[in-house]
A protein has these predicted regions:
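Catalytic phosphate/metal-binding cores of nucleic-acid and nucleotide-processing enzymes, i.e., regions
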Residues: 1-86
């Protein structure tokens, strides 16, 4: 199953260039339900609300502290780690 996430252009470009290998979501009940109610194998990133997308294989989804330079806040977040583009 594929998880679809909308990204701002800046973060989309970083992933596209291979500079970012994690995406972050708030540690809130909404994201807990959304991320763990299905067994996701892939993540599809959308550049803002356009039709431009790219899909990657998910390595893991966990809770922790992300990298500030990749847009993570200073508190615990859901970390979606991904590997190669499909």
């Amino acid at each position: 199953m594929t998880l679809h996430l909308i990204l701002k252009t800046h973060w989309y470009n970083m992933i596209e260039q291979g500079n970012k290998r994690e995406e972050y979501r708030e540690n809130k009940p909404y994201w807990k339900k959304r991320l763990f109610s299905h067994q996701y194998t892939h993540v599809c990133f959308h550049r803002a609300y356009t039709n431009e997308t790219m899909t990657y294989t998910i390595e893991s989804i966990s809770i922790g502290r992300g990298r500030a330079e990749w847009g993570a806040p200073s508190e615990d977040v859901y970390i979606i780690k991904f590997s190669e583009e499909v």
